[in-house]
């Protein structure tokens, strides 16, 4: 399929790619054609920022689509790189691990299946599941109150009969 890639400064080019190409590969092609360093590129399709580790088909980019390129200024790039550790996307690292244990075609197929399964599972997550996960993680996290806060709360609220019974039980246990 052919894609039209437009720079905001007016330059444009047409590139022949497949839907299975990664966004990182498209950036490489744009870099060669329009002389824009990959690190400075932000690719947009229908207002959505394209992530390097995803494929064009993940964004439903079809033939004759138009991709916009936004260039990040060099000063911002230098600041961004200074504050971020250099890490590679999970899928790239996983691909390297798979390449050590499988033939190239098999590693690519396994990686594709893993990505597809991951995306499908993400689509199935409901708000209720996310809330359950958050509650579980918060329950595991030890809650530490600043010293003296409990005493202040106890003095501030009126004592109920339940509070009185708890105090009596605590005194009896001692």
Curated annotation (Swiss-Prot):
Residues 141-174 are annotated as: Disordered. Residues 1-76 form the Ubiquitin-like domain. Its main location: cytoplasm. PROSITE patterns: UBIQUITIN_2. This is Ubiquitin-like protein 4B. Pfam families: Tugs, ubiquitin. One of its GO terms (biological process) is positive regulation of protein targeting to mitochondrion. Coiled coil: none annotated. Residues 163-174 have a biased composition (Acidic residues). InterPro entries: Ubiquitin-like_dom, Ubiquitin-like_domsf, Ubl4_C_TUGS, UBL4B. It comes from Homo sapiens. One of its GO terms (cellular component) is cytoplasm. May have arisen from retrotransposition of the X-linked UBL4A gene during mammalian evolution. It is found in: Cytoplasm. Residues 141-156 have a biased composition (Basic and acidic residues). Keywords: Cytoplasm.
């Amino acid at each position: 399929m052919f894609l039209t890639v437009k720079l905001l400064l007016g330059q444009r080019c047409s590139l022949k790619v497949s839907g299975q190409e990664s966004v990182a590969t498209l950036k490489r092609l744009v870099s060669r054609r329009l002389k824009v360093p990959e690190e400075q590129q932000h690719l947009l399709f229908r207002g959505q920022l394209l992530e390097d580790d995803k494929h064009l088909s993940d964004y439903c980019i079809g033939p004759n689509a138009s991709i916009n390129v936004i260039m990040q200024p060099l000063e911002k790039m230098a600041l961004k790189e200074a504050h971020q550790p250099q890490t590679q996307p999970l899928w790239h690292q996983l691909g390297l691990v798979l390449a050590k244990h499988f033939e190239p075609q098999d590693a690519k197929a396994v990686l594709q299946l893993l990505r597809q399964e991951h995306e499908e599972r993400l689509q199935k997550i409901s708000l209720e599941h996310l809330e359950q996960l958050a509650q579980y993680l918060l329950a595991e996290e030890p809650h530490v109150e600043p010293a003296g806060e409990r005493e202040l709360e106890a003095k501030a609220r009126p004592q109920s009969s339940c509070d009185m019974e708890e105090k009596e039980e605590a005194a009896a246990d001692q």
